[in-house]
């Protein structure tokens, strides 16, 4: 017999978008239920995504920094990896955060129902859980059911040596030779981790650069740093994958393809994600789901069914947790009666590689495509005292300005902890700041952060830390 629950709001999915929406609903006085397939809150991001990957990237960074100190007179022995302890560290990080979410849900009196939820009507969702079925009747629903890794039909995904991002983060073993299919953010982050732990890494990417969404000049800095660590096969694609007893054999074609099928101990398929819109029986609620699995929404996150909202990966690109969180707040506030809208000028993107590649607002390629009259100002970290002292002088900070209004419309940073420096640029774009606003803001010295102000000085023609191309010529 099914258990029945009634709620003013039900949130389907407890990733960052979903739990943020549920907690905001509760804070606004709404009786809220949240449905989650995992045993803990946090969704893919906290359990098998953003957070565990950052825990492992921290380990990788420390290993690489220790090796680099040899050049400065500090010599360590070869690191000895206890993979079980590394895994425990990752799990400790996850448990701390998911435990915190459980406490906040309890404090807010959010009812958590574990299991897979599907619509059975415009006001009902049935949850199939370990302890049986639960039917949730709701006044309003917020769909935050996320996405899953893309699978290709010619790849034997059932073989345990064929990984998706979830498998890679389980850290069951460190393969001797690992192929990363896809030179995007997820693939390169995992390449960083497994290289530091001892794997030989091949990366195959069909485009002519890694991280295709970013500008080439920024990616070039990253590629220069890692070209001796990874075997990069650009403008190349996988055509066949065969699982044999002694390994996974991969055939490729393109500019860098090997002549024969290459043997690997494991293959990570990191070619993107697909939304879960078609897994929810959405049609039973009258919801429109497009052919790719996305649910279309307006700026209030409302679907074609007025009392059902959708947020996060399932509503479209970019599939980023921080976008979903803000969408979740908007949906909750609209349900509570507020006239709020999701209308950001910019959404930041970060590849947490080493060095990090981060950008916000217009990229240079986007500005060109849109016919914007723009000007680029860059500050190389080779002129930064802090970067030189910290042994990361190969970084660069770039700002993109509207040439007519002098307003900043985009920015990018490549370098150690580059993602941490992105906030000022995002705020400047949202606030409509021009180059002078940024240049006249006093930035602390010596910091990597001051490179943002110095890039603005380059545009303004007031830079004194570099040769000034805009200086007045002496007679």
From Swiss-Prot:
Gene Ontology CC entries for this record: cytoplasm
Annotated residues for binding of FAD: 36-45, 54, 117, 313, 321
Cofactor(s) demanded: FAD
UniProt key word Oxidoreductase: yes
Top-level division of the source organism's lineage: Bacteria
Cellular localisation: Cytoplasm
Catalytic residues identified in the record: 445 (proton acceptor)
Keywords: Cytoplasm, Disulfide bond, FAD, Flavoprotein, NAD, Oxidoreductase, Redox-active center
Gene Ontology process terms (BP): 2-oxoglutarate metabolic process; pyruvate metabolic process
Cofactor: binding details: Binds 1 FAD per subunit.
The EC number(s) this enzyme carries: 1.8.1.4
Catalytic activity: N(6)-[(R)-dihydrolipoyl]-L-lysyl-[protein] + NAD(+) = N(6)-[(R)-lipoyl]-L-lysyl-[protein] + NADH + H(+)
Gene Ontology molecular function terms on file: dihydrolipoyl dehydrogenase (NADH) activity; flavin adenine dinucleotide binding
Entry annotated with the keyword Cytoplasm: yes
Stated role: The branched-chain alpha-keto dehydrogenase complex catalyzes the overall conversion of alpha-keto acids to acyl-CoA and CO(2). It contains multiple copies of 3 enzymatic components: branched-chain alpha-keto acid decarboxylase (E1), lipoamide acyltransferase (E2) and lipoamide dehydrogenase (E3).
Extra remark: The active site is a redox-active disulfide bond.
Similarity annotation: Belongs to the class-I pyridine nucleotide-disulfide oxidoreductase family.
Protein name per its UniProtKB record: Dihydrolipoyl dehydrogenase
Lineage: Bacteria, Pseudomonadati, Pseudomonadota, Gammaproteobacteria, Vibrionales
Protein encoded by which gene: lpd
């Amino acid at each position: 017999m099914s258990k029945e629950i009634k709620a003013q709001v039900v949130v389907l999915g407890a990733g960052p978008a979903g739990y943020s929406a549920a907690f905001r609903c509760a804070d606004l006085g709404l009786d809220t239920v949240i449905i989650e397939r995992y045993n803990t809150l946090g969704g893919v991001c906290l359990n098998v995504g953003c957070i565990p990957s950052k825990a492992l990237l921290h380990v990788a960074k420390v290993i690489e920094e220790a090796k680099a100190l040899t050049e400065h007179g500090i010599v360590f022995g070869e690191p000895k990896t206890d993979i079980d302890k590394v895994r425990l560290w990752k799990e400790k990080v996850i448990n701390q955060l998911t435990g915190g979410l459980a406490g906040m849900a309890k404090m807010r009196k959010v009812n958590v129902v574990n299991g897979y939820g599907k619509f059975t009507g415009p006001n009902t969702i049935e949850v199939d859980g370990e302890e049986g079925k639960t039917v949730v009747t709701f006044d309003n629903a917020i769909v935050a059911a996320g996405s899953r890794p893309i699978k290709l039909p010619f790849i034997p995904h059932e073989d345990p040596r064929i990984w998706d991002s979830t498998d890679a983060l389980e850290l069951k073993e460190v393969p001797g030779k690992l192929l990363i299919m896809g030179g995007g953010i997820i693939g390169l982050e995992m390449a960083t981790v497994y290289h530091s732990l001892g794997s030989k890494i091949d990366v195959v990417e069909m485009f002519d650069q890694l991280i295709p969404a970013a500008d080439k000049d920024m990616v070039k800095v990253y590629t220069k740093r890692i070209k001796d660590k990874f075997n990069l096969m650009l403008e190349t694609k996988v055509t066949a994958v065969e699982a044999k007893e002694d390994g996974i054999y991969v055939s490729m074609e393109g500019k860098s393809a090997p002549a024969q099928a290459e043997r690997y101990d494991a293959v990570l398929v990191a070619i993107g994600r697909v939304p879960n819109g078609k897994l929810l029986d959405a049609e039973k609620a009258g919801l429109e789901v497009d052919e790719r699995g996305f649910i279309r929404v307006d700026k209030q996150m409302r679907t074609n069914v007025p009392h059902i909202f959708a947020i996060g990966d399932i509503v479209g690109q970019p599939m980023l947790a921080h976008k979903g969180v803000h969408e979740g707040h908007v949906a909750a506030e609209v349900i509570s009666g507020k006239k709020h809208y999701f209308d950001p000028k910019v959404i930041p993107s970060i590849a947490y590689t080493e060095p990090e590649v981060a950008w916000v607002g217009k990229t240079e390629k986007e500005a060109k495509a849109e016919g914007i009259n723009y000007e680029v100002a860059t500050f190389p970290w080779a002129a930064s005292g802090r970067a030189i002292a910290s042994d990361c002088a190969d970084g660069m900070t770039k700002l993109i300005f509207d040439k007519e209004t002098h307003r900043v419309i985009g920015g990018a940073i490549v370098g150690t902890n580059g993602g941490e420096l992105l906030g000022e640029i995002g705020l400047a774009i949202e606030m409509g700041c021009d180059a002078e606003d940024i240049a006249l803001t006093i930035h602390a010295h010596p910091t990597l952060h001051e490179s943002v102000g110095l890039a603005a000085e380059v545009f303004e023609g007031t830079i004194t830390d570099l040769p000034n191309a805009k200086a007045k010529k002496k007679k």
